[in-house]
Amino acid sequence: MKALNKETAPKVQRPERIIQFGEGNFLRAFVDWIIYNMNQKTDFNSSVVVVQPIDKGMVDMLNAQDDLYHVNLQGLDKGEVVNSLTMIDVISRALNPYTQNDEFMKLAEQPEMRFVISNTTEAGIAFDPTCKLEDAPASSYPGKLTQLLYHRFKTFNGDKTKGLIIFPCELIFLNGHKLKETIYQYIDLWNLGNEFKTWFEEACGVYATLVDRIVPGFPRKDIAAIKEKIQYDDNLVVQAEIFHLWVIEAPQEVAKEFPADKAGLNVLFVPSEAPYHERKVTLLNGPHTVLSPVAYLSGVNIVRDACQHEVIGKYIHKVMFDELMETLNLPKEELKKFAEDVLERFNNPFVDHAVTSIMLNSFPKYETRDLPGLKTYLERKGELPKGLVLGLAAIITYYKGGVRADGAEIVPNDAPEIMNLLKELWATGCTKKVTEGVLAAEFIWGEDLNKIPGLAAAVKADLDSIQEKGMLETVKGIL
């Protein structure tokens, strides 16, 4: 079997126009895959220089393969099973700024550089006041980026045509706003002056983005078969689902410079990221949170099996299409398409997503993902959404513990104060006390949910039904 490098595989030389902070599975299977498709299908013609954001990382592994690797997409596409392998050739080189700081800083001197993309984890966009301008490099990602921007400003004497377009991909709501704020903190801490601040404001753009693709990562279980198929000894294969979405809160002139739409990619440039964030939380995370306890207490362990179950499948459909979708303000057809994509993702034959892994911290999840929908539905329709109410009753039942009908032990996991509260309430043996006690817990909900008209009575009725008839019969009663 051949080693994978530029001697054994074709690698096109393209202008270095993108600096990418992060070399992990997600960026390589999402951003670099998107850039590969843009290079193939448009005149984007750009390569990526990867910068390792922390001192330990995968730069050496990448360089050993001349920065070539394969993406293995697996899942359903319009009902068809897809399992494809693509060699990604967009990374020109990978740098470790902790050992190659001069080369890192020289990236700022390249006139063709135009974009910065990052994924340094949720903890990556943070202000560290101990960072100094003369550090080689600054320890934080925003510190390194400020060093780079300041060097570029000086190199080109404040030329406003040499600004950079910055797309953070960290999983933080309004990540661009947070990154920009942190850069301003470094400008002030390091006294970089008003001229630089004005150049940064006017020549550069830091844009909030929302990313969505499940990336399981290195396919340990299938790697021998994959290597056999590609005939390369690729140690950086990364597996991902087919679905991808990148929402970028930026004007159309930025979209023209980053023409992902012309490559047929699901990359949207929008005036506000917020409705898309709300859509994802409501239609992807919201159903996950309620389907998991309903499925588990019905004896179903995997998300895909729950979707395909005769009764639970109808429950999930009801919650998504009849309840949660009714609470969002985006165009109906767009929401329907997104919900159908979500169901296809839940049905992915290659991913065994255990419902128990979703049930960790179910109460806070319900509060952020499902409760807003329950309230909006009540406000708009004048009645409670039965599926979301049953989902809450299922969570409360799950936290009772005990064993399922098949003998499997029920082991809830949440913050100690939530676990203690549920233990005390269930010890009373009274579903009215359990319901009212949970709904009154302001440390969970930020308010007393007993004040929502009819909610306590509806949850109690579902709890009683689950105790008497079991989960499946209770679900059938609301369909």
Curated annotation (Swiss-Prot):
- The name this protein carries in UniProt is Altronate oxidoreductase
* Keyword NAD set for record: yes
UniProt family annotation: Belongs to the mannitol dehydrogenase family. UxaB subfamily.
Q: Where does this protein come from, organism-wise?
A: Bacteroides thetaiotaomicron (strain ATCC 29148 / DSM 2079 / JCM 5827 / CCUG 10774 / NCTC 10582 / VPI-5482 / E50)
Q: Give GO cellular component annotations, separated by semicolons.
A: cytosol
Its UniProt pathway annotation is: Carbohydrate metabolism; pentose and glucuronate interconversion
Catalysed reactions listed for this entry? D-altronate + NAD(+) = keto-D-tagaturonate + NADH + H(+)
> What's one GO BP annotation on this UniProt entry?
mannitol catabolic process
* Classification of source organism: Bacteria, Pseudomonadati, Bacteroidota, Bacteroidia, Bacteroidales
Q: What is its EC number?
A: 1.1.1.58
- Gene this chain is encoded by: uxaB
- Supply the InterPro entries for this chain: 6-PGluconate_DH-like_C_sf, 6PGD_dom2, Altronate_OxRdtase, Mannitol_DH_C, Mannitol_DH_N, NAD(P)-bd_dom_sf
Q: Which UniProt keywords apply?
A: NAD, Oxidoreductase
Per UniProt, NAD(+) binds at 18-29
Where, by residue number, does the polypeptide cross the bilayer?
A: none
Q: What GO MF terms are annotated?
A: mannitol-1-phosphate 5-dehydrogenase activity; tagaturonate reductase activity
What top-tier enzyme class does this entry carry?
oxidoreductase
- Hydrolase found in the keyword field: no
A Pfam family of the record is: Mannitol_dh_C
The record's section on Gene3D superfamilies has: N-(1-d-carboxylethyl)-l-norvaline Dehydrogenase, domain 2, NAD(P)-binding Rossmann-like Domain
In terms of PANTHER family, this protein maps to: ALTRONATE OXIDOREDUCTASE-RELATED, MANNITOL-1-PHOSPHATE 5-DEHYDROGENASE
